[in-house]
Amino acid sequence: MKFDFRRVDQLPRLAWCATLTRGHDSVVVHHGPWVETRDDCFFEAAWDGDFRAGRFDEAATMLGTGARIDGDRIVFSTATDTDFYLFSVASGDTLIVSNSLAFAMVQGKTSPDIRHPYYLYDFFALRRTGLTRDPRRLRTADGKRLNVHMYQRFAVNQRLDIEARAMSHQPLPVSFDSHVATVRMTMAAVFENAAHPGRRYPFTPITMISRGYDSTAVSALAAKLGCRHAITFSTGELGYDDNGADNAARLGLSVTTSKQFDFQRLPGHPEAEFCASNPSGSGMLIAGLSQQLEGRILLKGDSGDFVWSLSEIDAARDLRRPQIRALATASMNEFRLRTGTLIFDVPGIGAIHSTAIHALSSSPEMRPWSIGGTYDRPIPRRIAEEAGLSRDAFGQEKMYGANLAGDEDTLKPETVADFDRFYAAANVPWSFRQRHRYLRRDTLTRPVDALLEYLRDTPGAAKLYKRFAPWLMNVTAHRANDWRRLSPYLYLFHWGFDQTKARYEL
């Protein structure tokens, strides 16, 4: 097998799309200008291993994606977190693989199915069921097979046979010190790889920080490893001030403070690429930071909600997230491909061992760092306090930094108007347009809410919750927010694709 690289400077910097044809040993790869290419591999990635060796497909932690020749096969590698995927479209004698859902659809000559508004819940189902159902198929307008590959390495030969490859993992944590040592060593290795002088385009770290547990702990670790700059937002989703600037200063970090809705000042429809990445589009608050994030590793703490949680429900195997209700980071993919940004979800290091990490959080060793209440995470608290932050400086109240796409107060007025035109002209099923189909589902939402709340709060019922919650949530189109008034905005994914596809038309 061999690569036929075709650089296209007009593509987003980190985007790539590989075309494999049955019986041919040459794989055509169209790619943006920042994708690193070698005779035997290509990647837009940093990993916890030697850069020159290029064995990212053996790494336990990998930011970004890539592919490498292994004899008579091409091995494709996804990111090792659960927010960024590879997408494949199979049609006849051709297989398309890309790190962009829009790119895969355009080159696969397909598009979202306008008869299917529920892509949001397809992605929720992917996260809620984890590795127990991978890859997951998405519907397309013409019925072509489009798969989403999460936390996966897979090999493809000339016959287009696909073979799953084993993933590498970090060691099982047995104590706080061993867990944090693994996280710290992994971060250091990734930073070294990302800054290697052999790169045409190196990456340097920048960290998100708020007053919450996870981003504060991540920033404390990053500061000790040479990270010098942080980003914070001054207002949370519900009007709370979640500004982490004071803590950033205490950690020795310079900080850029942005208001949550600054992206609304941008021209055009900056929300579109977020909606095209993931139907929630809720990571759009970073749209106004594109210049600050060029050539950066953006450090985030999102998966701390699960990995560092004390809730037994969150201690799920196979990277399942039974009660996940937000997909903010997953909606940032098109943005990061365009700006040239790698995203590092630090609590996700070793997340495959979430049951062991949960046991550690609940252990006697960690009790001095447990403050009680519903918002209590001993591991990130200990990390931050041992870095010099006071107990009352963070982790006091859960706030939400992500925006919910589909709210007229969130989207730009110009975007709302453009979406309304798209929705009015689209061949949306009559039953959905009249909301009959949605309301039929919604009649189940309240009793399902009551059942899930009972299972969540009943001692000993966590196993039942983890088993049945993902299925119940998706059958009822369950969402934390009131989708009865937002249901047309489930079509933001279709609109986002329509707005974004031109960047991938070669």
Feature names for model-found ranges:
Residues 312-313, 391-463:
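PAPS-dependent sulfotransferase catalytic core
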Residues 1-263:
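Cysteine-centered catalytic environments shared across enzyme families
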Residues 158, 165-387, 401-414, 459-463, ...:
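ATP-dependent adenylate-handling active sites, centered on carboxylate activation for C-N bond formation
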Residues 102-118, 127, 371-391, 432:
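Charge-dense polyanion-binding interfaces
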Residues 1-25, 434-506:
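Membrane-proximal basic amphipathic "stem/tether" segments
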Residues 33-35, 45-49, 53, 322-337, ...:
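Long, acidic, intrinsically disordered low-complexity segments
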